């Protein structure tokens, strides 16, 4: 069994010994620490917390523990039930709550679950805030409410309709153009909450022809829930043998979006953000964009094509959001299909990603494959190197940066990013595993692989 504690929350596998995994005891301890932190921050005797969950098998069990612990800590709770991550984030601000807890392990397999923690803006906590909650949890520095001050469950209603109506109200979403285009769409929601949210969104957008795959929110994922090409053979085959205009694939909590073209070919998860950004930059006559250091260079190219400015952030949604606020970014996100559109909210949101992409598709008059051909074409490779426990990763990365300082532009905000004229490499230590990750991008898959192999060999030579 596994339990991983980090600044963004706690995640682990369900079951096992009392000292292992994400069990009722560790769940209650961490929830109590979060509630204590919120009470300290707000100075409120009864803070209001939103709780939402994806469709994982363990979701009901974890939900009961989390809500019960929050009540025991004197917090009031609005339980919005089965909900996407962005829906829960928007409910925090919509209900003027003091925080929120999302019960989801995102793209991890079904035996995993997690608690993701939000502030009163519906955004993930900062590094300092996360560390303080970990400290409170470890020290058990919290007190439960007495019997006269136990919290209450104020409501148990979905917030999905409010979320969808907010998407439709965006000036950049053209519902009439989408309706007139009369698209036939397919989607795969991997047996989680996307099976509830996507049909409702398509209906609101006037999309009448919908082919649904793995839409029943049972938590029994039909395939690996991470939306990568090797896991999406079913929807690709279904589209390739029918007259579908576009396919959408989401992960279990609907904050990542992958697109399939009309031939059943993978659009490229990195290019979800590129396409949506291209549309918004054109609509607004330019603007600033942000993605993390491991995301495709194509976003920078498209941004500069429209006269805008691109900025890279450290890996992690909270870092991307911080940089977006600093630069006043029009759009941002991550290369894993995460679209962050501040006009709606500061969080990755596949629902707004779908609405914006369908608007782009309708207005362009192009097929999805034709749209993809208008963007710069790059290929990526991802490698890893196991890190022995006695090795100082910081010293290793410092050595790498020094040796390559004259080879290209060096960025050290998150590991070592080396930008070369036609390619780049990003080497960073994993936040959750004892490994070093190597990301490369080049004009061809062969060149990206060669670059990754080169840097893997360099790192291994440091370890020998």
Language-model-derived ranges and their functions:
Residues 1-68, 72-73, 152-184:
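An N-terminal, well-structured beta->alpha segment
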